A protein has these predicted regions:
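N-terminal auxiliary segments of SAM/dcSAM-dependent transferases
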Residues: 2-47
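Conserved alpha-helix/loop element of class I SAM-dependent methyltransferases that forms part
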Residues: 52, 59, 63-86
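Class I SAM-dependent methyltransferase SAM/SAH-binding core
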Residues: 87-89, 98-164
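Conserved SAM/SAH-binding loop
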Residues: 95
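A short acidic, Gly/Pro-enriched loop at the edge of an enzyme's catalytic core
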Residues: 164-179
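A short glycine-rich, Lys/Arg-flanked "PGG" loop and its adjoining helix->strand segment in the class I
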Residues: 192-207
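Acidic carboxylate diad motif detector
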Residues: 210-212
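Substrate-binding/catalytic lobe of Class I Rossmann-like enzymes that use SAM or dcSAM, i.e.
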Residues: 221-316, 322-325
Length: 327
């Protein structure tokens, strides 16, 4: 039985209400819409969530949103055993918050990739500002390979469709110690290809740290239509997978399960309660309206996310994998 949850409609959300649950026309068209969405909305993401565009993981009720977001990174580090001074490929890096954290805190050499031109621009700007402050300089410039020194590590950002990462990094010969992907794989039309490419770019013994959104197993048609389809529509997602679906695809791609899946839905759901309260700003809804249906559907899908968590139909989990052959 579906749990009762306040839909929390407001005068703003009612004013801009739009039906959700439409299917996507083609996967290429969906990818184009995803790129456009992040190019247009990333400045708003920064204002809403800060530099970490992902869920928070609350270990206790007193923690702030920002502390909870760092908690999620630390949880992924624990289950994946990604160590200090690792070479990391951060797939779907957003505006670079995790990449900078891994570089400055663990001394990692991090390459962040995103399909969004705007996100690369913002990530570079934030990284240079942090590096200049860290080095007590007015300005810093990247090295010949595009890396900016940050703490004990360094980081760079590349605009790249993640489905092409296997070929793009082929010349490196599987040189990454870790691949990191947080809340990005759910956007990918070809998830099997991601795991195959991860196998290609990892060195033997390399780790994959993964956090993502999932649909629950064995959903009724009613639950799927009420809870999952609106999320797929508003969040620009191809058909969602189950947690076991990712495990199966990873194994088919040559990876071994290291830890998980660990369902942390109850510990992250608060993210959307906070977010719903943050978006009650007329200018944000007006901006979304100016972007057409996708902009409004995105904001309206926040309610579906909250409902899905409450009903147990929508889940959040972390998983880690390993490429066989390490010492």
């Amino acid at each position: 039985m579906a749990a009762a949850i306040d839909s929390s409609t407001t005068p703003l959300s009612q004013q801009y209400d739009t039906p959700l649950g439409l299917g996507h026309s083609t996967m290429q068209a969906l990818k184009d819409r995803i790129k456009l969405h992040y190019d247009l909305a990333s400045d708003y993401y920064l204002s809403l969530w800060g530099e970490h565009i992902h869920h928070g993981y609350w270990e206790n009720d007193s923690q702030t949103k920002e502390e909870a977001q760092v908690n999620l990174i630390q949880l992924l580090l624990r289950i994946s055993k990604v160590g200090e001074n690792s070479t990391v490929l951060d797939v779907g890096c957003g505006i670079g918050g995790t990449s900078r954290y891994l570089a400055s805190t663990l001394g990692c050499t991090v390459t962040g990739i995103t399909i969004s031109t705007k996100q690369v621009e913002i990530a570079n700007r934030l990284t240079k500002a942090e590096a200049a402050k860290d080095q007590e300089k007015n300005e810093v410039e990247p090295d010949a390979d595009g890396f900016v020194k940050l703490g004990r590590g360094k980081v760079r950002f590349i605009e790249l469709d993640a489905e092409k990462m296997g070929d793009f990094f082929a010349g490196l010969g599987g040189s990454f110690d870790a691949v990191w992907i947080s809340e990005a794989l759910s956007h990918f039309p070809n998830k099997a290809l991601f795991f195959e490419n991860t196998f290609k770019v990892l060195r033997p013994g390399g780790k994959l740290a993964l956090a993502d959104w999932f649909k629950a197993e064995n959903l009724s048609e009613t639950d799927f239509n009420n809870d999952i389809k609106p999320i797929e529509d508003g969040m620009l997602l191809p058909p969602m997978c189950t947690q076991q679906g990712y495990v199966d695809l990873a194994k088919q791609g040559g990876l071994s399960l290291l830890d998980g899946p660990k369902d942390i839905s109850k510990d992250v759901a608060r993210t959307w309660d906070i977010t719903w309260s943050l978006i009650q700003n007329p200018s944000l809804w007006a901006f979304a309206f100016s972007q057409g249906r996708d902009g409004i559907a995105f904001l309206q899908s926040f309610r579906a996310m909250r409902r899905g968590y409450a009903n147990g139909t929508f889940q959040y989990a972390v998983i880690s994998f390993e490429k066989p052959g390490g010492n």
